[in-house]
Swiss-Prot record:
Amino acid composition bias (Low complexity), ranges on this chain: 809-823, 1021-1040
Modified-residue entries (Phosphoserine), positions: 1022
Protein's organism: Dicentrarchus labrax
PROSITE patterns attached to this UniProt entry: JMJC, ZF_PHD_1, ZF_PHD_2
Region feature Disordered, mapped onto this chain: 450-560, 722-756, 770-1062
Cross-referenced InterPro entries: JHD, JHDM1_Histone_Demethylase, JmjC_dom, Zinc_finger_PHD-type_CS, Znf_FYVE_PHD, Znf_PHD, Znf_PHD-finger, Znf_RING/FYVE/PHD
Gene Ontology biological-process entries: protein demethylation
Protein name from the UniProt record: Lysine-specific demethylase phf2
Length: 1081
């Protein structure tokens, strides 16, 4: 029976859980615990000899250290940087001199460190307490030592141990570390800094300072029944041996920290958290070799503070600190976040998130603590307001910072990252809204109280960078007349400084100051805009043009109302002797204002805008064009935030819209519109950026109707354009306006009810568009080809009646007089377009509801078109259809998106509406051939519907080939597979699409077109319809080449390809290519 091998001096079998080392002499294996070799020390041993071999071979030899840096790659010390924490580093650090911390550290007794002191002086500098008396701090007896820690916490508790020399950490049981601590031969410098004992027996004998317990968010605001447990950061035990060093760091979560030295001594190196120092710290910490750079060398000042036995040090949030232990030390500490340094805590937290640094003392669920604090602050603010009290300024500022962070964390793109720390049963959006409202109330009341003692002009502080646009002040929340009186008094002092402000008008940093007071502030801003002198003539045109582009309809009523208020209230506000009288009037009207506020906030925004526009219609402005334009433009540029206190809870979205409006470019032209015989400047620009907010569009579409009837003849002199001036002068290609067609169409739908439908719009479009439109056609196809097309149509189940050809005939005769000029205009539009090709797809988009209207009706309407012109909205850029023509054609909308990038499509500004009939003379484009497509389609249709006509078609093929040399037509292939398939692909889209839309078929007598834009009798390369200019161009060129190839090999190409034997198979293949179910041209 085989025996189990045994090892080591203890002669025990191999144990996988124990570390073993091999002797280089006897080749036996020994347990590290038996021969006194630690696992961490083994890599440093070069040749190992067991205790038995040491007698004959000598002691074990260690590897030679080339450098104190942990990168011991054999380089000399003068080349390699010194590693932070190494023996060389500690020796040099001890010998250096630093500025004394007496300049920055505040020394207080325990009784002086109170909540009132911190609220009055803040907690921005370190505080040192010489004794623990009065701090409310509980500590063990001075005889308490490391072995007692082991007894209270437990010997088997795992702790993170930092190897100071290498600045690395490893796991170790507390019992093993205590053994190391008491050993006389310490081969390494080990440090324990994160032994958190709040859930152990030692928790009862250590109590944090009372001021910390009063400030701590975790202690006060974290619910006991929360699903997420409280962060365990309040009580740490620090066991540090001599020469322990912790490199520069900021506490996690921007937490403040307190230290109390029970035994020994600690030296703190402190750096102020200025913006420059924080930026330097972030750069240093993110570098790969930061462990070889002493951070204190990069900043202007690093203070040295020695904390001796029995002393307590409080380090504020954000301070960058490093810690050196000159002698063995036992200390206690704890981290806490609080309301006094919310801004710095958030900043430090953001730095921590960006650095993604792994730390031994994290602050878990920091964002969850913030949510609980936000809920607490909301309840606290509400209670204070009900008791006619105001929160402390640091609370208001902290609430604004927290609310801003809430908004950032709940954004759509950031929600996934932050939703794990969102507390249960918390409604973030409601909390943000309510907290913003309470902040606004507190800010306004606080500013009013500050300005109450003196009537002098108060110095307005610039708004905080973290401040958010808040909710409007509701009079219902104003608790007492005293606050109201204070607010009115605060509204008066800002009046005198109006004269010095106008020179700063072109700048935009002033608006945030305006909402200082609810009503008075608004009037002040409005009056400033009204009374300011006009700018230089050189900048006036730019200002006026800029105003036209950025003013939207939702703002115009408010601006006009603002001017009206200024004119009506100016005398009151100039005199300073009416304070009491004004106050009494406002007190009497308080209920009215309250009801009006509630009424406004209970209604949708659109209703409020429409009501204000009715007031705008009744408002008469005294002043000339210059004054009006200047006021309106500056109202937008300088007073955008002034308008906001009037709005309801959607103030955040509205402010965002205003911000986007400000970035729009200055228009280089004015837009004019004609309405009911009167002319006025169109204050609502037609072209808009693509990033226009949808909410803006809905406002415009809802409000356009009441504003449109212009009843103020005072605006008439502003117009410089003639009624009879040609609309051609204002035509321009605007590719950016295409996404806006739908929203503008919706406006016209509401006011186009009096029009006679799409026919009147078609007639109107011809006049709006000028002479740039062509509706003429060309001679139709031959009768034999017509029969082939009829066969194809019957196979595709497309109905066709003879009467449907009449529109083409009538429009042919009707437009003969304009054929030459129109065709030239179309050519110019095609060649001058480029990127505007998708506009030429509009004819088929606008016409699907009009397939069966005869041209006799159209002719009668054409004679009466002048009667309908006044009821139709006419625009130089767009012509809008009536209500029924926009809804049933999703396929065309998707098609227009696909072809936006075409570079060679023809373009005409008026090609959106009008009958889709053939054009006469159009220029040929290289490589665009249609004849092969026509013959292939005709052949496939003929074989399907008339089998007996196949022989006739084959007989004609020879004569067709002879003619091809003269007229440049590729040979006609009836049964070969390559060319007909590609021809069918691009051609029957034209056929079927126009059958659905215009219904043009043959009529007896004379050559007829097989489909609009396709004629077999005249061989022209450019025969493709505007709807398929991109696809047909590429397909025709390929089919031309293929047709030539197949024509040359006609003798041996009698055999058909698989799946192409019959026209039905070929047609099925074509239909599969067009996956949207339509045959598109």
């Amino acid at each position: 029976m085989a025996t189990v091998p045994v090892y080591c001096i203890c002669r025990l079998p191999y144990d996988v859980t124990q570390f073993m080392i091999e002797c280089d002499a006897c080749k036996d294996w020994f347990h590290g615990s038996c021969v006194g070799v630690d696992e961490d020390d083994a890599p440093d041993i070069d040749i190992y000899h067991c205790p038995n071999c040491e007698k004959t071979h000598g002691k074990s030899t260690l590897k030679k250290k080339k450098n104190w840096s942990k990168h011991d790659t054999g380089q000399s010390t003068d080349i390699k940087a010194v590693q932070n924490g190494s023996q060389v580093f500690i020796k040099e650090l001890r010998s250096r001199t630093f500025p004394s911390a007496d300049d920055v550290v505040v020394k207080l007794s325990g009784s002086q460190l109170t909540m009132d002191y911190l609220e009055e002086n803040g907690f921005n500098e370190p505080i040192l307490a010489q004794k623990k008396d009065g701090l409310g701090l509980s500590m063990p007896a001075p005889t308490f030592y490391i072995s007692d820690v082991e007894n209270y916490v437990g010997p088997d508790v795992g702790v993170d141990v930092v190897d100071v020399t290498k600045q690395t950490d490893s796991k170790m049981k507390l019992k093993e570390f205590v053994d190391y601590y008491y050993s006389t031969n310490r081969k390494k410098v080990l440090n324990v800094i994160n032994l958190e004992f709040s859930d152990t027996r030692m928790n009862s004998i250590v109590e944090s300072p009372q001021i910390v317990r009063r400030l701590s968010w975790v202690e006060n605001y974290w619910p006991d029944d929360a699903l997420l447990g409280k962060p365990k950061v309040t009580k740490y035990c620090l066991i540090c041996v001599k020469d322990s060093y912790t490199d520069f760091h900021i506490e996690c979560g921007g937490a403040s920290v307190w230290y109390h030295v029970l035994k020994g001594e600690k030296i703190f190196f402190l750096i102020k958290p200025t913006s420059a120092n924080l930026s330097l710290y972030e750069r240093w910490r993110s570098s790969s070799n930061h462990s070889e750079m002493f951070f204190a060398d990069q900043v202007d000042k690093c203070y040295k503070c020695t904390l001796k036995q029995g002393q307590t040090l409080f380090i504020p949030s954000g301070w960058i600190n490093a810690i050196l232990t000159p002698v063995d030390c036992l200390a206690f500490s704890g981290h806490f976040v609080h309301n006094l340094s919310v801004e710095m805590q958030m900043r430090a937290y953001e730095i921590e998130k960006r650095l993604k640094v792994k730390t031994l003392t994290p602050f878990p669920n920091f964002e969850t603590a913030c949510w609980y604090v936000g809920r607490h602050l909301l309840e606290r603010f509400k209670g204070l307001h009900k008791a006619n009290k105001q929160p402390a300024p640091y609370l208001i500022h902290g609430a604004k910072i927290i609310n801003g962070a809430f908004r950032a964390w709940t954004k759509k793109q950031a929600l996934l990252e932050h939703e794990d720390e969102l507390p249960e049963n918390m409604k973030p959006s409601q909390l943000i809204k309510d907290l913003a409202k309470e902040i606004r109330l507190s800010e306004n009341a606080t500013k009013a109280i500050k300005s109450e003692p003196s009537i002098k002009v108060p110095v307005e502080e610039p708004p905080s960078t973290h401040s958010e646009p808040e909710e409007p002040v509701s009079p219902a929340h104003v608790p007492s007349p005293s606050r109201e009186k204070a607010r009115k008094k605060a509204s008066k002092p800002p009046k005198p400084p109006k004269p010095p402000k106008p020179p700063k008008m072109p700048k935009a940093p002033k608006p945030p100051k305006v909402p200082k007071v609810k009503e008075g502030g608004k009037k002040k801003a409005k009056k400033v805009k009204e009374s300011s002198p006009p700018p230089k003539p050189s900048s006036f045109a730019a200002l006026e043009s800029h105003a036209k582009d950025i003013l939207s309809k939702m703002d115009q009523p408010k601006k006009t109302k603002a001017v009206k208020n200024v004119l009506s209230m100016s005398e009151k506000e100039i005199s300073k002797q009416n304070n009491l009288e004004k106050f009494e009037i406002r007190e009497q009207n308080k209920n009215k204002t309250e009801a009006k506020w509630k009424y406004k906030n209970s209604k949708p925004d659109s209703l409020l805008k429409m009501e204000e526009e009715c007031k705008f219609d009744r408002t008469l402005l005294s002043g000339n064009k210059d004054k009006f334009s200047f006021t309106m433009s500056h109202k937008k540029m300088l007073g955008s935030k002034t308008l906001k206190p009037q709005t309801n809870s959607s103030v955040f979205g509205s402010l965002q819209n205003l911000k986007e409006d400000k970035t729009k470019p200055v228009r280089d032209e004015y837009e004019y519109v004609s309405d009911e015989g009167e002319l006025k400047i169109d204050e609502f620009p037609i072209r808009r950026k693509k990033n226009t907010v949808k909410r803006d569009q809905s406002f415009l579409s809802d409000i356009r109707e009441p504003i449109q009837p212009a009843k103020k003849p005072k605006f008439q002199p502003l117009v410089t354009k003639n009624v009879d001036s040609s609309d051609e002068e204002t035509l321009h290609i605007d590719t950016e306006a295409k996404p806006e067609v739908k929203s503008r169409n919706s406006k016209v739908k509401k006011k186009g009810g009096s029009a006679a439908g799409i026919l009147d719009l078609l007639q109107a479009s011809k006049q709006v568009g000028g002479i740039d439109y062509s509706t003429n056609s060309q001679p139709p196809a031959s009768p034999s080809t017509q029969e082939a097309i009829q066969g194809m149509l019957s196979m595709a189940n497309l109905s066709s009646s003879d009467s449907l050809q009449q529109p083409w005939s009538n429009s042919q005769s009707k437009n003969n007089s304009q054929s030459k000029s129109n065709s030239h205009g179309a050519q110019g539009g095609k060649k001058g377009s480029g990127g505007g090709g998708n506009n030429s797809k509009r004819p088929t988009k606008r016409l699907p509801k009009k397939p069966r209207k005869s041209s006799s009706i159209e002719s009668l309407d054409y004679d009466d078109d002048q009667d309908h012109m006044d009821a139709c909205f006419k625009d130089s850029d767009y012509v809008y259809p009536s209500l029924e023509s926009e809804e049933d054609n999703p396929v065309f909308k998707s098609r227009s998106k696909k072809r936006k990038s075409s570079d060679d499509t023809p373009y005409s500004p008026t090609a959106r509406v009008g009958p889709s009939v053939p054009r006469q003379e159009r220029p040929a484009r290289d490589g665009a051939r249609v004849a092969s497509i026509e013959t292939g389609l005709a052949a496939a249709a003929a074989k399907l519907s008339h089998q007996e006509e196949q022989q006739k078609t084959k007989k004609k093929k020879k004569s067709t080939k002879k003619k091809a040399i003269v007229i440049e037509e590729p040979p006609k292939i009836s049964q070969d597979s390559s060319s007909p398939e590609h021809n069918l692909d691009s051609q029957d889209g034209s056929l079927t699409d126009h059958e659905f839309n215009t219904g043009t078929v043959k009529s007896p007598g004379g050559p007829q077109p097989m489909a609009p834009g396709v004629f077999l009798s005249q061989r022209r390369p450019s025969m493709s319809s505007p709807n398929n200019s991109t696809n047909s161009t590429s397909t025709n060129s390929s089919s031309m080449a293929k047709g030539d190839r197949v024509g040359s090999a006609d003798a041996k190409a009698k055999r058909l390809k698989k799946g192409m034997a019959t026209a039905k198979q070929r047609l099925g293949k074509i239909l599969k290519i067009h996956r949207n179910g339509k045959l598109l041209l």
